[in-house]
Amino acid sequence: MKVYLGIDTSCYTTSLCLLNEQAAVLADERRILTVPEGKRGLSQSEMVYQHVRNLPELTEKIASYVAGNTVCAVAVTDKPRRRDDSYMPAFLSGLGCARSLAAMLNVPLYRLSHQENHLLAAWRAVGKEPKEPYCALHLSGGTTDILRVETDGDSTVITRIGGTTDISAGQFIDRVGVALGLPFPAGKYVDRQSLTALGEVNGFPVWHRDGSISFSGRESHIQRLITAGETSCEIICAQTMHTVLNGILELLDTALAGNEYKTVVAVGGVMENNFLRTSVEAAMRRRRIEFIPAPQGFSADNASGAAFKALREYHKAGI
């Protein structure tokens, strides 16, 4: 059986994924990087160190799924975004591993950005991207972007049309979570706490202008509430999630105002959040916009988009 390997070494997860000819996941191995308690992140050198340790172990785990099959192509993320000024050492870990494997196996190696990996993780479940331009919402620990995506023949053009001017939605949530004593990354813990809040909870308005939003002021406000100690953890978490939602909806309102897009794709680790996922879906339904989130479990960092890239490019090349 022909199989396709994807590799992604992002800021906080080492990921390998193996797909078959039908783009079904045969193996999905991930390891979240270890962040010391109370810390809000890692340095790039720490990320590289952990990726270098994780890659051989995850490769050994995935090897049993490769046995008896033929790896036809490998794809790897090599930078955060498909831009000349986009660079992050963490991705060199995966790139080095992918180059070595592709050379040893004598198979093609394809590169893509981490952002493209996220988008393809969503489209893998659908099968193919639309011919007309679509709108993408990328929400993760380091990114809050609204994108215009257009597939033109063999190339995909991604243009940022909006997003945050300061901290991302993921950073906002993580900073609040760590201040509350929750583990980092804090997204799933803040999500769980928010769902237990009693009574009606509203978020705070978010500054917005011409497709840009700012979360830093609201993060500072919520940090002051935490310091004051008069608001429960559950309420703080719910207020944070509702505030993030307010920002997301402002971005989407601006992007969709011209009625250019029929489809919105939502990707990134923050979109694993149950409240945000269902709320954005409901908002798009009211607008009669097709809403395509990455499959549950594949919004967070993973390598399924890279593996899907390997499969598609291999068939395009007619090898």
Positions of PLM-derived features:
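Glycine-rich beta-strand-to-loop/alpha-helix junction loops that act as flexible
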Residues: 76-79, 140-142, 265-273
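A contiguous, well-structured pocket-lining segment that forms one wall/lid of small-molecule binding clefts
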Residues: 188, 192-264, 270-287, 311-317
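Glycine-rich phosphate-binding/hydrolytic loop that grips phosphoryl groups
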Residues: 118-121, 294-319
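Gly/Thr-rich phosphate-binding beta-strand-loop-beta motif of the actin/hexokinase/Hsp70
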Residues: 1-26, 133-150
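Glycine-rich phosphate-binding loop plus the immediately following alpha-helix
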Residues: 113-116, 150-198, 220, 225-229
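Short glycine-rich, Thr/Ser-proximal phosphate-binding strand/loop in the N-terminal lobe
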Residues: 10-49, 155-160, 293
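Short beta-strand-loop/turn "lid" adjacent to the catalytic site in phosphate-handling enzymes
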Residues: 60-98, 103
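Conserved phosphate-binding catalytic cores of ATP/NTP-utilizing and phosphoryl-transfer enzymes
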Residues: 1-2, 107-135, 308-310
